[in-house]
Design a protein with these regions (language model features):
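Nucleotide-sugar donor-binding/catalytic module of glycosyltransferases
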Residues: 1-133
Length: 133
C-alpha cells in the first residue's frame, strides 16, 4: 500500500482574515501527504487570491454558489477528493502540527474509522489569542 493521502475540504466565504492561518497550519503538518480543497462561495474579499498565492500544488481552489448551505460546499469538495481519507477544516480554524500524523496512527490501527475530537476555542482580545483551556 502506498502512502496514505488525506483530502482536506475547506469551505470558505470572505475568509481573507483567517485563511492564511488555516493554510499555514496545513503546511506545518508533520505528515505532508495531503491535499487541501478550498471551496469558495464567491467571496467578495481577497480570499481566493490569497489561496492562489500559495503556489503549492497540494492547495486547490474551486468556486461554488452554495446558497448559504455550507454542506453543499463540503459535498462539492468531496467530488474533487483523491485521498484515502476525507477531513473537514473550516477556513477560520487551524490544526496543531501533529493533527494528521495522529489521525494516521489511529487509522493504521483501526479498520473502520470515523475520527472526531474536542476542540479549543480561541478568542481574540487586546493582548492576542486566548484559549478556553
Amino acid at each position: 500500500m502506498g502512502k496514505i493521502l488525506f483530502s482536506i475540504i475547506i469551505p470558505s466565504y470572505n475568509s481573507a482574515l483567517f485563511i492564511r492561518r488555516c493554510l499555514d497550519s496545513l503546511l506545518k503538518q508533520t505528515y505532508s501527504n495531503w491535499e487541501a480543497i478550498v471551496i469558495d462561495n464567491h467571496s467578495t474579499d481577497d480570499t481566493v487570491s490569497i489561496v492562489k498565492s500559495y503556489g503549492d500544488s497540494r492547495i486547490q481552489c474551486y468556486l461554488i454558489h452554495n446558497e448559504g448551505v455550507i454542506a453543499k460546499s463540503r459535498n462539492y469538495g468531496i467530488t474533487f477528493a483523491k485521498g484515502d481519507y476525507v477531513c473537514f477544516l473550516d477556513s477560520d480554524d487551524w490544526w496543531k502540527e501533529n493533527k494528521l500524523n495522529t489521525c494516521l496512527l489511529y487509522c493504521n490501527l483501526n479498520e473502520e474509522v470515523f475520527i472526531y475530537h474536542q476542540f479549543e476555542l480561541y478568542r481574540e482580545e487586546q493582548r492576542g489569542l486566548h484559549s478556553n483551556k
